[in-house]
Regions:
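Catalytic cores and adjacent flexible loops of soluble metabolic enzymes
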Residues: 1-321
Length: 321
């Protein structure tokens, strides 16, 4: 489906880093960056920009959890391709140092994406305002709306409507639980309460609908779409970059570099990292639950494939039986 307003944001490093604590080698990240440059993808998210803490020590987490300026400059300066994507990083509310953020003129970062839950909306909007004051393009990614009370979602949207510093408002299917009807429902809800806002979508593939739901977002008028190469991301992963580029039929995109980096980098990586659909993550999506329990279950080789046992435990937790 060709529509020139549509932009693709590849978040392979940021979402994929949730699998391995951002322990990607610099050569791997440079290979991903080069593929994104040559593919014509509009934006690449290089990771999270968190502060080191007892929760997130550098002894446990890799460079892409912090996205220090010198590290990003090494990657961006390593390749000049057929296009130069904008550089994005993600903020998590409560885990950042907004006072230490450089002005845009002193950074290779173009866009800061602020992720929050509905109950954190006031803090998130303050962060967005301060990022905009420093010259950055901004997105607000409201997570886990499928598990939120709709009246609270509406209240959050009313706050966004009064915050013009938000360049893009994101619908995020954090648990990979949405069906297309729910996607349309939330898009209409967002448009009702924030009618002038540009919007984006970030899907997860727990019930194997990330690609289909991204297509539904296009039909419903969203123009900024998140993807990951080979669908690599937390748990069941995300909408694959290579599939969406093919679907969009936009001549500015070239899918061959994406398949090349999959063959050279991602296929070997699959031998040591797991991502993509399986029945454990499917259960998490069907029950609209955070995938952390599924990921913990999969990490235990003795029971990793015991989907019936996992379902029994999860449904008892939901029903209270």
């Amino acid at each position: 489906m060709f529509r020139k307003e549509i932009k693709v944001l590849d978040c392979t490093i940021r979402d994929g880093g949730l699998i391995n604590n951002y322990q990607f080698t610099e050569s791997f990240v440079k290979a991903v960056y080069a593929a994104i440059c040559d593919s014509g993808v509009d934006i690449i998210e290089m990771g999270k920009k968190l502060v080191e803490s007892a929760e997130y020590p550098r002894t446990k987490y890799g460079e892409w959890n912090y996205c220090d300026e010198d590290v990003l400059k090494r990657v961006v300066g390593s390749y000049q391709g057929r296009s130069q994507p904008k550089i994005a990083v993600m903020f998590d509310i409560g885990r950042i140092d907004i006072n230490g953020l450089s002005d845009k003129k002193d950074s290779v970062v173009d866009m800061i994406r602020t992720a929050c839950y509905v109950k954190q909306i006031d803090k998130a909007l303050d962060v967005v305002k301060r990022c905009k004051d420093k010259g950055y393009e901004t997105t607000l990614n409201i997570m886990a709306v499928s598990a939120a009370i709709e009246t609270e979602v509406i209240e959050a949207l009313e706050g966004v409507a009064n915050t013009p510093e938000v360049d893009y408002l994101y619908l995020v299917d954090s648990y990979g639980a949405f069906y297309s009807e729910q996607v349309t429902h939330y898009i209409n809800l967002y448009k009702k309460y924030v009618p002038i806002q540009k919007m984006g979508f970030h899907g997860h593939n727990n019930i194997q609908l990330a690609y289909a739901n991204t297509q539904q977002c296009i039909i419903d008028g969203m123009n900024l779409l998140d993807t990951t190469i080979n669908g690599m991301g937390r748990g069941a992963g995300n909408c694959p970059t290579e599939l969406l580029l093919g679907f969009l039929r936009n001549p500015k995109y070239e899918v061959r570099p994406i398949y090349e980096v999959i063959q050279n980098e991602f296929v070997p990586l699959r031998k040591v990292m797991e991502w993509g659909y399986n029945d454990i993550y499917g259960i998490s999506g069907l029950l609209n639950q955070h995938p952390r329990d599924g990921m913990k279950w999969r990490s235990d080789k003795a029971k990793a494939e015991n989907c019936h046992d996992f379902y029994e435990i999860c449904t008892k937790a939901v029903t209270g039986d």
